[in-house]
Regions:
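Oxyanion-binding "anion nests"
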Residues: 133-178
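Conserved small/polar residues in nucleotide/adenosyl-binding loops
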Residues: 187-196
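Loop-centered beta-sheet repeat module
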Residues: 84-137
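Long, well-ordered core segments of solenoidal/helical folds
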Residues: 1, 28-48, 81-107, 154-172
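Acidic/His metal-coordination segments adjacent to aromatic residues that form catalytic metal sites
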Residues: 47-53, 109-122, 176-183
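Blade-loop segments of beta-propeller domains
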Residues: 1-17
Length: 196
């Protein structure tokens, strides 16, 4: 799965090892893979389905935590804009596809957009939004202060922070579906929200 965001995520660990030990050999495999993906972007549609190849793109919310911090860090480490340009392009396309501009939350994937909860609310998966929210600081922290796209990620984080705050229930927890307070409590989300 060369393109799958989950399989690029492991690069975050290699990048941290490189930063700690200053050994470029630790970066080589992740850099080669990320460079290949960025220089040969998938032509698959940005629609997650059960069909083969639909996870080659960042077509589900979790992917925005998995791969972008790797590309941001590789851009900063190498100075090669191919990493930044690829990250920005894929990220923005995913946001344009899955981010609800009214609620400032993400649908898990395009199949969820028309779905509604029992209370009639839009279906925003708590864990997926937690992944996105926790990933944004990793992207921002990995970009140089003068990077032109940094403000895009900061703005998105700020919008989401307010939306996430509003969805927190009286018991201090979030729900599996963020706009349905009667859905199951989701303690897993606490870690993501705290990290963000």
């Amino acid at each position: 799965r060369v393109y799958h965001a989950d399989d690029i995520c492991v690069g975050q660990a290699f990048i941290e090892m490189y930063r700690r030990f200053d050994d470029k050999r630790m970066l080589q495999p992740v850099m080669e893979r990320a460079y290949y993906v960025a220089s040969h972007p998938s032509k698959a549609p940005l629609q997650k389905t059960d069909a083969v190849g639909t996870t080659e793109r960042w077509s589900w919310s979790d992917a925005l935590f998995m791969a972008p911090p790797v590309y941001a860090a590789l851009y900063t480490i190498t100075g090669d804009k191919i990493f930044l340009n690829y990250m920005d392009s894929e990220y923005i396309e995913c946001v344009d596809s899955l981010y609800d501009k009214e609620e400032h939350l993400f649908y898990r994937d395009n199949k969820r957009i028309p779905l509604r909860e029992k209370n009639g609310s839009k279906q925003f998966w708590g864990r997926g939004n937690g992944w996105v929210f926790a990933g944004l600081p990793l992207i921002v922290d990995n970009l140089p202060l003068n990077c032109s796209s940094r403000s895009y990620y900061i703005r998105l984080f700020t919008e989401m922070a307010e939306a996430v705050r509003k969805t927190q229930c009286k018991d201090g927890d979030w729900r599996t579906s963020l706009l349905d307070p009667d859905s199951v409590s989701y303690t897993h989300l606490r870690a993501h929200e705290t990290r963000g």
